[in-house]
Amino acid sequence: MSSEQAAAMGRVAVLMGGDSAEREISLISGRAVFEALRRRGVDAEAVDTAQVALAELTGFDRAFIALHGRGGEDGVIQGALEALGVPYTGSGVLGCAIGMDKWRTKLLWRGAELPVPPGALLRPETNRQALIGSVGLPLMIKPAHEGSSIGMAKVERPEELEAARAEAARYDDLVLAERWIEGGEYTVAILGEEALPAIRLETPRGFYDFEAKYRSGDTRYHCPAGLTEAEEQQIRQLALDAFRVAGASGWGRVDFMRDRQGRFWLLEINTIPGMTDHSLVPMAARAVGIDFDELCWRILLDSRRREAGRP
């Protein structure tokens, strides 16, 4: 990459922080991206959106969005940037809004006949016995609009259900209950039109929760994931299909479970995944020879789509 290419990106705002429940992770991601772009010669500036008025972003030529959670990953900041005429990285308004809503994402995936675990919305008035009868136990209870596994819990007995629902409801009015898939956890990163190598996650914590993602030293990551060539091709294609059906674009991540019979099940999509030293997209990129600085540069380059009027 030449200095002329870096200069052509103009003044770049690396958006981070914000005021969501994932603020601290976003600050770490954003700082890492900012430093990578600066090393590449990009005129980047770190911008905490909780401390800067949106109108001030008109002074930038483009934005690298490293915000996680509400206000950053749900289409809100994307819509604001479009109104301001500032090109940005990643998915557009629609893709982000859908991707942030686990319930509606799964409705779309089911409509496209993609493999999704059985599930239902869990409300205070929901008939618990009917839910368990139709979906089964164990269950995974989760807020419909939070990331980083915030508010999630595994329920193995009927008497645990209400406490798990109440905890998830602290973060969201919509609470999702879906069948727990016993098996291996996998994730596939998307970069442009390409699915990167799958990663298999191994944690002693029962599932890949917030602690396992960001704090635990016990989580193990396997890339290559130990799949056959056909299985690797299958999970990558499934990730691309799920990403496109949800209206996502640019870059992101799709999470899976693989059951004991070898079937892959879609869990959720991440339109702005973490970019910390524990993060999965940089790990998958390294597996194909793309270092962190190059990864950030490629994601930034993708913002040119919006200058051409493409979603």
Swiss-Prot record:
It is an enzyme of class 6 (ligase). Disulfide bonds: none annotated. GO terms for molecular function: ATP binding; D-alanine-D-alanine ligase activity; metal ion binding. The gene is ddl. PROSITE patterns: ATP_GRASP, DALA_DALA_LIGASE_1, DALA_DALA_LIGASE_2. One of its GO terms (cellular component) is cytosol. Cell wall formation. Mg(2+) 2 binds at residues 268, 270. It comes from the Bacteria. It catalyses: 2 D-alanine + ATP = D-alanyl-D-alanine + ADP + phosphate + H(+). It comes from Alkalilimnicola ehrlichii (strain ATCC BAA-1101 / DSM 17681 / MLHE-1). Binds 2 magnesium or manganese ions per subunit. It is found in: Cytoplasm. One of its GO terms (biological process) is peptidoglycan biosynthetic process. Its EC number is 6.3.2.4. ATP binds at residues 132-187. Its cofactor is Mg(2+); Mn(2+). This is D-alanine--D-alanine ligase. Pathway: Cell wall biogenesis; peptidoglycan biosynthesis. Mg(2+) 1 binds at residues 255, 268. Belongs to the D-alanine--D-alanine ligase family. Residues 106-301 form the ATP-grasp domain.
